[in-house]
Amino acid sequence: MESPPHPLLLLLTLLVAAGAASAGADDLVAELQSLRSRSPSGVIHLTDTSITRFLSAPAPRPYSVLVFFDAASLHSKTDLHLPQLRREFALLSASFLAHNPASADLFFADIEFSESQHSFAQFGVNSLPHVRLVRPEHTRLAGSEQMDQSHFSRLADSMAEFVESRTGLEVGPIVRPPLVSRNQMILLVILFLVSIPFLIKRIMDGETLFHDRRVWMAGALFIYFFSVSGGMYGIIRHTPMFITDRSDPNKLVFFYQGSGMQLGAEGFAVGFLYTLVGLMIAMVTHLLVRVESLQIQRFTMLAVMIIGWWAVKKVILLDNWKTGYSIHTFWPSSWR
């Protein structure tokens, strides 16, 4: 009968195994940091092989990984906003790295469907956009935590809230690149200083755009059209001009039935009808009254009423089709 292993030998074996595991984890962290340093935004591009190496390592791992799932073939689908979300994800990574340059607790990565279909299947991803947080204790990729769609609403800022609430790490303010670079700003200032004498002369002579009433008229029309077409709503909500029909990918949808969403095309269509009526009223009150021919005035007024009735009818029908609400006519009681 063999004697049991000596306790000292068993302890030594366990220490060697723990040291090897620690060294392996340190090697993974060092490799991730090296890959991160090669990326301008700090986002590490992973494939099936690297996902197995970094995310299937024995738990608990000393790091978490936030993974963005991408598909280049779907970038043309404007309703998914994949290119924009990918840029915001890169901003999130760069901002975290700017505020935590030496952090090895969280890494940002992306994978592409055509290169890593096996990993998509392991995560159980079947729709995009999709972001997963793989924490140190996760032993299965499918068991990682999915970012809710609501965290895409404010782009990088809402993604940062998800990261901070799930990891306890502070991302810090999102660092966005300036619209104008330093050299461009210097050039603009120089051009402005050089043009000051010429601007003063044109202002004194009354030859600027601000002295042209046609410019003010065009600006007023643009503001009116922009307001009635829901342009500000489209900018705030990032609504697309149109979407692809789910039942027929080759068909485009310009009018969305339902009050929960408005496409840019339908807003512009309604804005055009409103602007058309406004222009006709302006023409009648400012131009038609100067026409001396009574027949031309009557014919023009009849045409304006017909076109105005058609435009208002189209707006009412579209509103009824979209929201389900109907507009009823109420006559004065004395007319009944």
Swiss-Prot record:
Residue ranges of the TM segments: 184-204, 216-236, 268-288, 299-319
InterPro entries recorded: OligosaccharylTrfase_OST3/OST6 (IPR021149)
Family annotation (Pfam families): OST3_OST6
Membrane in keyword set: yes
Topological region Cytoplasmic: 205-215, 289-298
Record membrane topology: Multi-pass membrane protein
CC terms in the record's Gene Ontology section: oligosaccharyltransferase complex
Subcellular location: Endoplasmic reticulum membrane
Main location: endoplasmic reticulum
Signal peptide limits: 1-25
Subunit structure: Component of the oligosaccharyltransferase (OST) complex.
Family: Belongs to the OST3/OST6 family.
Role noted for this protein: Subunit of the oligosaccharyl transferase (OST) complex that catalyzes the initial transfer of a defined glycan (Glc(3)Man(9)GlcNAc(2) in eukaryotes) from the lipid carrier dolichol-pyrophosphate to an asparagine residue within an Asn-X-Ser/Thr consensus motif in nascent polypeptide chains, the first step in protein N-glycosylation. N-glycosylation occurs cotranslationally and the complex associates with the Sec61 complex at the channel-forming translocon complex that mediates protein translocation across the endoplasmic reticulum (ER). All subunits are required for a maximal enzyme activity.
Protein's name in the database: Probable dolichyl-diphosphooligosaccharide--protein glycosyltransferase subunit 3
